[in-house]
């Protein structure tokens, strides 16, 4: 809602914000200032514009039939000042609600990692590659998801230039040669096997998927799904996953611009595996430079990058 979006932006910018709540579009009549500030509406955004660009923004929103209203301005006061019907109804220092607010300090302990599966290389040598491949490709976590995405129209408005099934979806930007690439990735087993490395890996996977279609990665959002934070090991998984996410995004200069946390995902006190999901977006400056995953011609060269040993301990191959 307006509370978190306005205060967080003011805090990050080291500024204040003045909002006229009488100008906020509301679905219900006679909403109080308290209700307006706490109401959470899906797909509603708060944007800070450069002065003088209001009409330019309005034309864009009008084109797509979206509600748009100028509801306030940034200030140097470092306070959140709210007005309703020409009366000031709140005047609070921003840092009181952000940097200086009380924080949870939950107890946590390092998650107990699952036992490593002993890989018998000699036994694997007796397996038939065809049988192994068929079994792996039939697993729900690996198999084609076409049966899902073929059920909806992924070419609405004719802007899709790379359809589902590749490393990332790509849609063109109207009036330009540019395109936006998007990928959503998650790996619960990896994060369960090693939360710190799993957190790093999921950010890197999003990055790799975007560059694989020719895009420059810009930013990510996350959805962090975990068990009860009151369980110290579950909380430990969360702490280490978030640490991994942070380290990888900082190293790759791939900022996390938004996200949410979902706790208490459990059945009979048994929590789910740590499941951070990452949504990444990137920019392709010229659609002509977009890359697809299919081989282009005979004698294409295939490369393996990085070490290929020591990754089987919790792999689908070893577990199944």
Predicted regions, residues:
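Glycine/proline-enriched, intrinsically flexible loops and inter-domain linkers
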Residues: 1-320
């Amino acid at each position: 809602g307006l509370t978190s979006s306005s205060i967080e932006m003011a805090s990050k910018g080291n500024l204040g914000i003045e909002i006229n709540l009488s100008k906020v579009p509301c679905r219900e009549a006679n909403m109080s200032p308290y209700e307006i500030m706490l109401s959470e509406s899906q797909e509603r955004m708060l944007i800070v514009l450069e002065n003088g660009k209001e009409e330019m923004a309005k034309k864009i929103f009008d084109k797509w039939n979206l509600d748009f209203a100028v509801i306030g301005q940034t200030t140097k006061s470092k306070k959140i000042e709210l007005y309703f019907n020409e009366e000031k109804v709140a005047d609070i220092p921003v840092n009181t609600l952000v940097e200086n607010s009380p924080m949870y300090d939950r107890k946590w302990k390092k998650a107990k990692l699952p036992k490593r599966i002993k890989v018998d290389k000699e036994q694997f040598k007796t397996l038939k590659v065809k049988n192994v491949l068929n079994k792996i490709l039939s697993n729900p976590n690996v198999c084609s998801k076409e049966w899902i995405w073929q059920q909806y129209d992924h070419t609405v408005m004719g802007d899709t230039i790379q359809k589902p099934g590749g490393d990332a979806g790509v849609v063109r930007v109207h009036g330009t040669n540019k395109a936006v690439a998007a990928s959503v990735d998650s790996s619960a087993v990896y994060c369960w096997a090693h939360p710190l490395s799993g957190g790093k890996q999921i950010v890197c996977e999003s990055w790799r998927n975007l560059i694989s279609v020719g895009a420059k990665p810009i930013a990510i959002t996350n959805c962090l799904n975990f068990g009860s934070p009151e369980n110290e090991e579950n909380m430990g998984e969360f702490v280490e996953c978030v640490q991994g996410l942070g380290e990888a995004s900082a190293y790759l200069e791939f900022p996390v611009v938004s996200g949410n946390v979902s706790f208490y995902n459990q059945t009979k006190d048994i929590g789910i595996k740590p499941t951070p999901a990452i949504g990444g977006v990137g920019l392709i400056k010229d659609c002509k430079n977009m890359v697809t995953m299919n081989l282009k011609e005979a004698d294409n060269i295939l490369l393996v990058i990085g070490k290929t040993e020591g990754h089987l301990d919790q792999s689908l191959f070893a577990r199944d």
